[in-house]
Amino acid sequence: NADAIIFHTDICLSPKTNILDGRRKIACANFSSPPRNKLLRNEESMNFTHLHVHTEYSLLDGSSKIGEITKRAKELGMDSLAITDHGVMYGVIDFYKAAKEAGIKPILGCEVYVAPGSRFEKTPGESEDRYYHLVLLAENNTGYQNLMKIVSRGFTEGFYYKPRVDYEVLTEYHEGIIALSACLAGEVQRYLARGMYEMGMEAAKRYENIFGKGNFFLELQDHGISTQQYVNQQLVRMSEELNIELVATNDIHYTYAEDADAHDILLCIQTGKLVTDENRMRYEGGQYYCKSPEEMAELFSYAPQAIENTYKIAQRCNVEIEFGVTKVPKYEVPEGYDSWSYLNHLCYEGLAKRYPDMNADGEIDSTQGIYNIKERLEYELSVIQTMGYVDYFLIVWDYINYSRVNGIPVGPGRGSAAGS
């Protein structure tokens, strides 16, 4: 094999000796995925799960179609697969359904952006240090709820070029979440790549303190980039010194190795560059595809525990989403009431104000004769209760009432509770 020099983003990388096993490795080695029609029998497959996966919902960055990659994982003998799109979770439901249909367990996650300081700070720093990457996986339904809160806070409070969160948010919503240190853009890896080992250790200990012992893992990746070879060596050392376990991942951005060129064009669209531009963002080496368990085991033969840990993590992650069921938030009612009695109280109170001439039997004398308004109210309330919308009507009453009290105009609604 001839020596080669490649470009990864704006850094020139040359072939380097693999520090971990002493073998010479070319940084730009050509890899190809197994044939598309290859099916691994269960007895041939090994326990491995991809935990770092970007789909088409990582806009202009991931090109893996959800239906395609879930089927591919199944073909390669895996029984579970994660989704970890950049900063968003709007692909989770489609992924969950597709994974179930493919016969594999969906692991719901997100690769979030972590601000180096407060999420509220909106001042530009060094381009590399505006945010760090961190992979979060929901271990259970509590973790799934917390993960949604983390991502939402990134948009509502921390958005600055990217939806960022900070250590405060991670600490507040850490329960039920497993964290991985991510790629070279992760905080730990970024320090290590700069030769700042002690700073990397402090970052790792901080994340472990946030998520708890056994819930934070140091992430090994190898895409043929020489910097990763050095960082991986430091991560192995750090794992031994801090007793933080390793996990092996492939930073999947497309499903098959032959999709690399199409993905490169997608990056050009994202960055406004031409394919022929030399100094532009690119994912060199063609290794960001859904690799087989055998490929991953060979790539990380020096750290078999990191491979095993992918499956152990997958076994821990169990989120169940129920579809076809109306889920209404519970309205907090005053002491002495439940939702049903409080809605009745408000309705009868309003009835007395609107119809002061109503008699004790609930009858009013209209132009069309005697009309029992109380019977009508009781019927409407029974329908609301039967449909399970008691709390919903209280919620709508609450914000409409707040608007009226605070001088916010409220208009008639068409076909909605607000206009009732």
Residue spans of the language-model regions?
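Accessible peptide chain termini
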Residues: 1-2, 310
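Short hydrophobic alpha-helical segments enriched in small aliphatic residues
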Residues: 2-4, 9, 19-22, 29
